[in-house]
Amino acid sequence: MQTIHIGVLSASDRASKGVYEDLSGKAIQEVLSEYLLNPLEFHYEIVADERDLIEKSLIKMCDEYQCDLVVTTGGTGPALRDITPEATKKVCQKMLPGFGELMRMTSLKYVPTAILSRQSAGIRNKSLIINLPGKPKSIRECLEAVFPAIPYCVDLILGNYMQVNEKNIQAFRPKQ
């Protein structure tokens, strides 16, 4: 079974300064560990809400670490310093708006302010980048919604084959 390389990028001014512990990045790692059977190698970084820092981290995770999947958390709201979607768009060759649409629809079941979220997803080379919200509960809800499409998307961009733990979640792959 191939090792899946996963980038986890937390964008947070306060967590990057050690003001509080980054629980969101850990939540992403926990959920993906439940969903995938492959050996996983996580490449984890916390950066301030600075566009150039986010862009550099995304590029490093995609180009240097050759991550199959890069998941960001934080910086997707309407606040002035929330710029993760802009950084993602800048480094991607293609955007995948359906991921953000589904995450907003899912989150609206729980909170009306989900309409303010700007989650997005895109492709850089052979890496799928997905922007998630910043709260662990919301991360789990959004990943549960979009994960069924992730393994097939990674197949299509020629990433490593993701073996799904079907006891915990289902994924969709068209019949060969």
Swiss-Prot record:
Its EC number is 2.7.7.75. It comes from the Bacteria. The keyword Transferase applies. Pathway: Cofactor biosynthesis; molybdopterin biosynthesis. Keywords: ATP-binding, Molybdenum cofactor biosynthesis, Nucleotide-binding, Transferase. PANTHER family: MOLYBDENUM COFACTOR BIOSYNTHESIS, MOLYBDOPTERIN MOLYBDOTRANSFERASE. Belongs to the MoaB/Mog family. This is Molybdopterin adenylyltransferase. It comes from Helicobacter pylori (strain J99 / ATCC 700824) (Campylobacter pylori J99). The lineage of its organism: Bacteria, Pseudomonadati, Campylobacterota, Epsilonproteobacteria, Campylobacterales.
